[in-house]
């Protein structure tokens, strides 16, 4: 469960990072991206562990609120699933159609940009 939560928060952070404040960005990057402990972040910014914890929880809620309103992550994962299905179908049904395979690969590459 914790791994799934961390993956989701990291994904939401990737989508909505530009909407966060510098402090929120720093704390999230250090905690989720660089695997710092609450104590290490607190020491780095000369604040209490509780302040870091509270900021992280508020920021997680903000990220979830953004996703609830904008659905960027949800739509991205849905498009990726659909693209994977199309790619698998084309690969098995039309394995020798190089143009079709290139077009499907191009769609996949657009999502990764």
UniProtKB/Swiss-Prot annotation:
InterPro entries membership: RNA_pol_sigma_r3/r4-like (IPR013324), UPF0122 (IPR007394), UPF0122_fam_protein (IPR054831), WH-like_DNA-bd_sf (IPR036388)
Domain of life from the UniProt record: Bacteria
SUPFAM superfamilies cross-referenced by the UniProt entry: Sigma3 and sigma4 domains of RNA polymerase sigma factors
Pfam families according to UniProt: UPF0122 (PF04297)
NCBIfam families (alphabetical): PRK00118.1-4, PRK00118.1-6, YlxM
Functional summary from the UniProt entry: Might take part in the signal recognition particle (SRP) pathway. This is inferred from the conservation of its genetic proximity to ftsY/ffh. May be a regulatory protein.
Annotated family: Belongs to the UPF0122 family.
Protein name: UPF0122 protein LVIS_0949
Native source species: Levilactobacillus brevis (strain ATCC 367 / BCRC 12310 / CIP 105137 / JCM 1170 / LMG 11437 / NCIMB 947 / NCTC 947)
């Amino acid at each position: 469960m914790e791994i799934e939560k961390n993956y989701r928060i990291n994904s939401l952070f990737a989508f909505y990072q530009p909407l966060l404040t510098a402090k929120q960005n720093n704390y999230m990057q250090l905690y989720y991206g660089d695997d710092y402990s609450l104590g290490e972040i607190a020491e780095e910014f000369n604040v209490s562990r509780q302040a870091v914890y509270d900021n992280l929880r508020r920021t997680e809620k903000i990220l979830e609120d953004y996703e609830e309103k904008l659905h960027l992550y949800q739509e991205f994962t849905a498009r990726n699933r659909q693209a994977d299905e199309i790619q698998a179908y084309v690969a098995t049904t039309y394995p020798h159609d190089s143009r079709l395979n290139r077009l499907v690969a191009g769609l996949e590459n657009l999502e990764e940009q």
